[in-house]
Amino acid sequence: MLINLDFETRSKVDIKDKGLDAYAKDISTEVICMAYSIDGGEVKLWTPQFAIPQFLFNPEARFSAWNAAFEYNILRNVLEVPVRHDQFIDSMAMAAANNLPQSLDDCAQVLDAEFKKDPIGKRLIQKLSKPKKDGTFNKDPDLLDQMYEYCKQDVRVEMSIARQIRALSSNEQSVWVLTQKINESGVPVDPDELKNAVFLCENNKTAINREIVELTGGYTANQPAKLIEWLSSRNVIVDDLTAETVTKMLQRSNLTDEVKRVLELRQQGSMTSVAKYEKMLEVQVAGRIRNTLVYHGASTGRFASRGGLNLQNIARPSLGDAEIEEANERILVRGEGGTMEELSSLVRSAIKAPDGFTFIDADLSSIENRVASWIAGQNDKVELFRQGLDEYKAFASSALYNVPYEEVTKDMRQISKSAVLGCMFGQGAKGLVEYADGMGVKMTMGESEKAVKAYRHAYAKVKSAWYDFEGAAIAAIQNEGHPY
């Protein structure tokens, strides 16, 4: 039995702010309706005034939905139906694996599917799924009837897309299921430690703003336009006050003590990494942050991290290991004073195992680089991996800095890693600067041009493979049914 389904729900919790876990487990969350089709039949509707359909409890049933994690969580946590992850097929995951949009509306448009999403949905969700100012919900019968039809149409759209695109292979389906299990297990955090961090961040921001107001005559760290005017009055001309700009300005030797201090305060007060403490505290439920891992979230097929908190993009700490260990105990555990730099360096440390458990951080080492080299026949690089060498250090040593392998520093390796991973997919100099910036690495255009040239020389077979793959993809599309 295959059941295509879609839920419309209402809640006092904002799913975009709090995340799916908090949304599905909140006492205010209710089902408005469920549209469903059994084995491709007519799309029908269920509403909570009737008993929960027994077919949902069938352990042999399969469920298909767009973004199936939502339907799974509503079934498990709101309707208390004991479904399993391996019962689900996610048509959104299928679309992602076929390099199609992960928006139901956009995907249907791109495929010119038989059914299209009803644009009325956004208005209905605003009116029916979110509480009014008095905390109650709008239950207007006419609007609900429109919502019911909208929900049924979503199922028709999902079914029409699923019929048109290639299903996940059995192996990829098992990866998707494992992803859902990982998401349900979640990442452990200590709410009390997060509260300590948030409290100290707020204290620091207050102190920073108090000092910067005194220095500038009334401007805070979060008023860049006003600070630019103030700097201009001190004969310091800048176009913006981004983190990169401020860092470069602080390297100048001709700044007055007053200007230098204002820039330092702006740098501390605008640290975005510390905002993750607030988001962690907001989305965690009973010390767990769930549903942050996205199957096939990147166009290359790699995982992404979303759900209101990107756990794959936590800023690298500026402090050393010993400093972090001391600061962790003092700041997070005891809630005693800490600087913004220390707090920024402790974001990763906020994720930790409960007492009696060990938190193991594991990663596939240079997996994309290894596979790209192997597929392209870049055997000299494959041999480096066989010898257990670090290719990022090797590339930094031979191509970027001309220093012995053993003398490659942590910062050199990080720049080299950005260059290798960015250039692997054909990035030019401008694209590499942007790619590296996304990894938290600052590269000049000159450094980027040098890295691109060096990569394409060192990885000549990988470069050739780009055009081979492009030609094969075009030929496959033009000649359906033939492998290339």
Predicted regions and their residues:
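Metal-dependent catalytic core segments for phosphate chemistry
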Residues: G19-A22, D361, E368-V403
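Conserved "right-hand" nucleotidyltransferase catalytic core of DNA-directed polymerases
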Residues: M1-V13, C33-A35, N99, V110, ...
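Amphipathic, charged-and-aliphatic alpha-helical interface segments
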Residues: E202, V213, V408-G426
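Active-site-proximal helix-loop-helix substrate-binding element of RNase H-like nuclease domains
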Residues: K25-Q49, F55-R166, L389-L400
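Short active-site loop/helix that positions an aromatic residue
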Residues: A69-V81, N98, I228-N235, S365-N379, ...
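Cytochrome P450 catalytic domain signature, combining two hallmark sequence patches
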Residues: P82-H85, T206, V238-L241, E323-E325, ...
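Ser/Thr-glycine-rich phosphate-binding loops at phosphate-binding pockets of nucleotides
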Residues: F7-V13, A22-A24, N67
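Alpha-helical scaffolds flanking conserved acidic
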Residues: Q87-D90, E172-V177, T409-A419
